[in-house]
Curated annotation (Swiss-Prot):
One of its GO terms (molecular function) is dUTP diphosphatase activity. This is Deoxyuridine 5'-triphosphate nucleotidohydrolase. Belongs to the dUTPase family. GO terms for biological process: dUMP biosynthetic process; dUTP catabolic process. It is an enzyme of class 3 (hydrolase). The lineage of its organism: Bacteria, Pseudomonadati, Pseudomonadota, Gammaproteobacteria, Enterobacterales. The gene is dut.
Length: 152
């Protein structure tokens, strides 16, 4: 059975004026986050801004986190990506979800109220445990770094 996360809605316009976040298909990993704005915001080339989503989250389960990712169409067609490239939401964060938006394009871009601006994906978390060792067990690859395994 698929695990569910409780997402609180802070802004009463979400679900009324702006649609609730949804998964586009049964196989969608990400759900769309919308700009919960009172009016349009123009973003000049090279500029960044924080945009509220109207949602708050407390994942609570330390085995889960969420990541905010750019929407591929906005990045490819308009140069609109996340200001921090990927937003990480830890399980113990409790608060409103804000999206840092960066216009890396050459033209101004207008963010409209209710526009889909990013997507959020929930992911499992594995925490590393560090152990000081003298050497690793030998592998076929060894210390081969960038490009070591070839292109074909």
């Amino acid at each position: 059975m698929m695990k569910k996360i409780d997402v609180k809605i802070l802004d009463p316009r979400v679900g009324q004026q702006f649609p609730l976040p949804t998964y586009a298909t049964s196989g969608s990993a990400g759900l769309d986050l919308r700009a919960c704005l009172d009016g349009a915001v123009e973003l000049a080339p090279g500029a960044t801004t924080l945009v509220p989503t109207g949602l708050a989250i407390h994942i609570a389960d330390p085995s889960l986190a969420a990541v905010m990712l750019p929407r591929s169409g906005l990045g490819h067609k308009h140069g609109i990506v996340l200001g921090n490239l990927v937003g990480l939401i830890d399980s113990d964060y409790q608060g409103q979800l804000m999206v840092s938006i960066w216009n890396r394009g050459q033209d101004s871009f207008t963010i409209e109220p209710g526009e889909r601006i990013a997507q959020m994906v929930f992911v499992p978390v594995v925490q590393a445990e560090f152990n000081l060792v003298e050497a690793f067990d030998a592998t076929e690859r060894g210390e081969g770094g960038f490009g070591h395994s070839g292109r074909k």
